[in-house]
Amino acid sequence: MESIIARPRTRSSAKEKTQTMSAKKISANGNNIAVQAKSKRNTPLGVIKLARLHTLESLLCVYPAIWGACLSAGSHQKVFTPSSFLSVLFANWISMTIAHMAFCTFNDIVDRNFDGKVERTKVRPLPAGMISLRSAIIAFIVEMGLTVYISYATLGFDGALVCAPVWIASTIYPFMKRVVQWPQLVLGPIIGMAVFPGWVSVAGNLDTLRDAVPMFLATSAWVVYFDTIYATQDTNDDKKIGVKSLAVLFHNHMHQFLGFLGSIQIALLSFTARKANMSALFWSLGVCVWGLNIPFHLLSLDTKNPKTGGKVFLMNILLGLWITIVCVIELWTTTVMHLDVNDFLLKTVVHNITLTAQNIRSSVAF
């Protein structure tokens, strides 16, 4: 009897030992994961990467602000000293860069669970364990505080006031990817609104802000355009995990959709340039170059090859840089040097034609 009763106890003890060993293994594995996460931790680098300071992405927010300043100067026939000119450029650059840092950090905080499931984004600081969630939240709070302070200090009250809708909308954007098919249509106006602080930084008030609306719409269309291209890199992963985007929605009609957006950009940019009295320099090196880039982007994008999406996205960053350089040159020549660019270009062309004709005549006579 004793032996029969003892057997179940032995089996029970064996089960308890097995369960105990399993629990220890799970605990050990959990500790190993925690140790591995801590070993990867590099909070300063994590803050930098969350803020995208290691990339050129912040320029995408700076560009519209500089464009707005340039167009505002043309509309208001402003005159700048070299120092005031540089002050306007610096104010727009620093305020937009800090804001971009804050909201990229916020975006990664919200997306941390999704990012770990996508091949391209699983190496981002939070899913990779480079920075803790607590540290990321602290970084966002500090960056947001700097955003408000620096915008007010450099752009003034009116400038900070027109930035406020951008800040509010930026906190909504990460959640839109879970709800609708078109988060790019939210991101477009958010970045496009950077035109308004640039405009106000030159105008000095909100009285003529409505004149900046066409450029705001052109920029918004451009942002939707390049962000849809960017999203083509993740179309397959996005479909698997349920993330929605225009790249998923228009996957089979991508080139037609992008061509439509490109046409809107050029039409609105041309309208804005005409209203703001832009010179032949802006028309030839700005509007025309932008227009020529659209078909080149479409030819370079292959939706079956995700890597081309990243390359065409980079092309758009460089295109934005080119347009910004043209705007700065336009702003400098017309508002600081007080040069009539159209007259200067006309005289230059006539002078070169005359020299060419003289050289041809001399060659024939010889």
UniProtKB/Swiss-Prot annotation:
Cofactor: Mg(2+)
Function in brief: Polyprenyl transferase; part of the gene cluster that mediates the biosynthesis of sesquiterpenyl epoxy-cyclohexenoids (SECs) such as anthrobotrisins and arthrosporols, metabolites that possess a novel hybrid carbon skeleton consisting of a polyketide-derived epoxycyclohexenol combined with a terpenoid-derived monocyclic sesquiterpenol substructure (PKS-PTS hybrid). The SEC pathway plays an important role for fungal soil colonization via decreasing fungal nematode-capturing ability.
Topological type in the membrane: Multi-pass membrane protein
A molecular-function term among this protein's GO annotations: transferase activity, transferring alkyl or aryl (other than methyl) groups
GO cellular component: plasma membrane
Principal place of residence: membrane
Gene Ontology BP annotations: terpenoid biosynthetic process
Family note: Belongs to the UbiA prenyltransferase family.
Organism (species): Arthrobotrys oligospora (strain ATCC 24927 / CBS 115.81 / DSM 1491) (Nematode-trapping fungus)
Knockout or disruption consequences: Abolishes the production of arthrobotrisins A to D and asthrosporol A, and leads to the accumulation of 6-methylsalicylic acid, toluquinol and two new toluquinol glycosides. Shows substantial reduction in conidiation. Shows significantly increased ammonia levels in fungal mycelia.
Gene3D superfamilies for this protein: UbiA prenyltransferase
UniProt cross-references to InterPro entries, sorted A to Z: Prenyltransferase, UbiA_prenyltransferase, UbiA_prenylTrfase_CS, UbiA_sf
Transmembrane feature ranges: 53-73, 85-105, 137-157, 160-180, 185-205, 212-232, 253-273, 281-301, 312-332
PROSITE patterns, sorted: UBIA (PS00943)
Keywords: Glycoprotein, Magnesium, Membrane, Transferase, Transmembrane, Transmembrane helix
Source species, domain of life: Eukaryota
Up-regulation conditions: Expression is down-regulated by the cluster-specific transcription factor AOL_s00215g275. Expression is also down-regulated by the HOG1-MAPK pathway downstream transcription factor MSN2.
Record: glycosylation sites: 277, 352
Region (Disordered): 1-22
Subcellular location(s) of the protein: Membrane
Designated name of the protein: Polyprenyl transferase AOL_s00215g276
Annotated pathway: Secondary metabolite biosynthesis; terpenoid biosynthesis
